[in-house]
Amino acid sequence: MTGIGNREPEHGAGAHVGAAVSVPDAASIPHSPLPIPGARMRAPRIALIAGEASGDILGAGLIDALRRRYPDAEFVGIGGDAMRSAGCQTWFDASELAVMGLTEVLRHLPRLLKLRSAFRERVLAWKPDVFIGIDAPDFNLPVERWLKQRGVRTVHYVSPSVWAWREKRAEKIGVSADLVLCLFPMEPPIYAKHGVDARFVGHPMADAIAYQADREAARAKLGLSTSSTVLAVLPGSRHGEISRLGDTFFQAAWLVSEHLPNLHVLVPAANPGCKQLLAEQLSRSSLPVMRSHLLDGQARTAMLAADVVLLASGTATLEAMLVKRPMVVGYKVAPLTYRIVKTLGLLKVNRYALPNILANEDLAPELMQDDCTPERLCEALLDWFKHPEKVAGLQSRYLALHAQLRQDASARAAEAVAELLTQRELGIGNRESGGAGS
């Protein structure tokens, strides 16, 4: 996720992931179902922070699920339209945390620190029963730690990518959070090694996407025929990513079109700034204008309508997997960054795309850094276009991974929070101090 919590390498979604890892089925994951709490002296008070749009959606789903358990619960915090619609009283809007890149963060740092201080003092005075920080670890973990030291139960929802790099962060996260809610099944075992309570709840995106999504409907929405040959190209959702990958991706698409002359290319733009940059790159490419479609958003629709997807490594690879599309994954970082990471051995994975990490096998070709060339990308893309039998086998593997992640994440997250609330009610569990809400 973007925002004040800098993007984690997602190459996303424990231990050394390149090694064989036993991933438990949902049914085998330790799980303590609790009855819906009945006789409470008062409805629980729950504070939350979501720092961007994706966290706002997660927060809204969690609030809805908690409301089913606690109809009179009170919710306050930092969030957006989705959380407000779910009934959260937002003291500050999530947009106030949505800054990207080191330069922008530094420019806004005094304001962000002032906001964080004001929020934590106000929420402590409000006496919450639990505080839930949703992603944005750079902002939320210090809030969680400060509140935990004053006796507030704390939850961190969405684990940083401890399986990819800096695993020792898991122990530090446990200092801030009583409970970590994880989207991926390989994450809780890492936290367990460091004595931290972490639960796999599943991924909300897997809940939202049908097992068999309607490609014909997606094509109709975009004005494409069912017989069209379609490639979706997603070079990223940030200016830096698009600058590094866009020209390479569009050259690769042009090379594919030399073999498939009637190829349609779909290019979804995450926002107006990205759209302008993508338009400039498309104008420099040799792709036929009439068959290049620059879209406002609609990334999922574009992937669903496509025969094959070319995309940057990141969360989009998970979405492409969930709509069951064969993909080729490319990524480049600044050369100096790449040399530092390789030299110091900071990354603990030998796969980068989330489908490959989840499956612990190479389901999607990955072409990184110097290997990410138009020619190599074209070769990998044509392999999918020309071998439909391989696509059929891939889709069955994607379906199994989809089922593994589809756990009704909001309900499972609410159940884990309810257990924490019950422990608090009964005085169970270690507390840093006996402060707020005790």
Curated annotation (Swiss-Prot):
Residues passing through the membrane, by range: none
Alphabetically ordered keywords of this record: Glycosyltransferase, Lipid A biosynthesis, Lipid biosynthesis, Lipid metabolism, Transferase
Alphabetical GO biological process terms: lipid A biosynthetic process
Listed SUPFAM superfamilies: UDP-Glycosyltransferase/glycogen phosphorylase (SSF53756)
Pathway participation: Bacterial outer membrane biogenesis; LPS lipid A biosynthesis
EC class (word): transferase
Taxonomic superkingdom: Bacteria
CC per GO annotation: membrane
Keyword Glycosyltransferase set for record: yes
Catalytic activity: a lipid X + a UDP-2-N,3-O-bis[(3R)-3-hydroxyacyl]-alpha-D-glucosamine = a lipid A disaccharide + UDP + H(+)
GO molecular function, one term: phospholipid binding
InterPro entries according to UniProt: Glyco_trans_19
UniProt keyword Lipid biosynthesis present: yes
EC number: 2.4.1.182
Role description: Condensation of UDP-2,3-diacylglucosamine and 2,3-diacylglucosamine-1-phosphate to form lipid A disaccharide, a precursor of lipid A, a phosphorylated glycolipid that anchors the lipopolysaccharide to the outer membrane of the cell.
Family membership noted in the UniProt record: Belongs to the LpxB family.
Protein name stated in the entry: Lipid-A-disaccharide synthase
Originating species: Xanthomonas campestris pv. campestris (strain ATCC 33913 / DSM 3586 / NCPPB 528 / LMG 568 / P 25)
Gene behind this protein: lpxB
